[in-house]
Design a protein with these regions (language model features):
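Active-site gating/metal-coordination segments in enzymes
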Residues: 132, 139-142, 147-183
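Active-site metal-binding motif and surrounding structural segment of the metallo-beta-lactamase
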Residues: 52-70
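Metal-associated gating/positioning segment near the N- to mid-region
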Residues: 68-130
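N-terminal metal-binding scaffold of metallo-dependent hydrolase/deaminase domains
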Residues: 1-56
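Alpha-helix-loop-beta-strand connector modules within alpha/beta enzyme cores
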Residues: 120-136, 186-196
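Conserved small/polar residues in nucleotide/adenosyl-binding loops
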Residues: 247-248
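Hydrophobic faces of well-ordered beta-strands that scaffold small-molecule active sites
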Residues: 73-79, 107, 138-142, 167-168, ...
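Active-site gating loops and adjacent loop-to-helix segments of metal-dependent hydrolytic enzymes
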Residues: 102-104, 128-137, 200-242
């Protein structure tokens, strides 16, 4: 997996003592008030009371985390950074700064850029920009189809080799089942997941609101649940048939 910026390099130099916080770490089955020693960017010790005598406080930054929760960094697998091409909506710096402020240390960005991330040139641009502008790890997701238009496959192998961790057409379903089948065969061989937008557009295309009480009350075209359910069924069947990884 490609790490896209200097975030890990900064962590490697970090020495911290975090006191008086509540640690929530499911990987260690910890959910209690406890102190943490971080040495060279890694958790070295959990302890109660005062730091050990052999810890030189001059070499550590001391943080009082009273009334705070401490946890491993969060991961968001579906982020819209919109860079390149749509930076009036978001860019790599603003998006990663916002993520860091919310406790997210790794994010995966969808290919809904302009042009869409369907080739190595765009993937490399994202990684290079993230190296310069991001405080956190950014992992690009490449498009399944060229321009996300569903007509032909994107450069999936090349994009994964350049640093993409998964493939997706983001908010567009791959309507052509044969194309999705071929994409899943490629993704299986490479070992990356397909992140699927599940929708049967023939049922949802005229809808503006979920079909139900309020669509009827306000006489608005509704989107039935079955439009998503049919999409999920199809994608699961293709994933089962190809034995590939799918994230729905």
């Amino acid at each position: 997996m490609v790490q896209t910026n200097s975030f890990s390099k900064g962590l490697a130099k970090m020495n911290l003592i975090i006191l008086n916080g509540r640690v929530v770490d499911p990987t260690q089955n910890i959910n209690k008030k406890i102190n943490i020693e971080i040495k060279n960017g890694k958790v070295n010790n959990y302890f109660t009371g005062q730091p050990k005598k052999n810890i030189n406080p001059d070499k550590y930054e001391i943080i009082n985390a009273k009334n705070m929760i401490i946890s491993p960094g969060f991961i968001d697998l579906h982020v819209h950074l919109r860079d390149p091409g749509l930076v009036h909506k978001e860019n790599i710096k603003t998006g990663s700064d916002s993520a860091a402020s919310g406790g997210f240390t790794s994010i995966a960005c969808m290919p809904n850029t302009l042009p869409p991330n369907d080739n190595p040139k765009i993937t490399k641009y994202i990684l290079k920009t993230a190296e310069k502008d991001s405080k956190i790890n950014i992992f690009p997701i490449g498009a399944i189809t060229k321009n996300q238009q569903g007509n032909e496959l994107a450069k999936i192998k090349e994009n994964i080799k350049s640093g993409c961790i998964a493939i997706s057409d983001d908010g567009f379903p791959v309507v052509n089942s044969k194309l999705l089948y071929e994409a899943m065969l490629i993704s299986k061989k490479i070992g990356v997941p397909v992140i699927s937008h599940c929708e049967e557009c023939s049922l949802s295309k005229d809808g503006v609101i979920n079909e139900g009480k309020y669509s009827k009350k306000y006489d608005l075209p509704g989107i039935p649940n079955s439009s998503e359910e049919l999409g999920v069924l199809r994608d699961i069947f293709i994933a089962e048939y190809t034995l590939s990884l799918i994230h729905i």
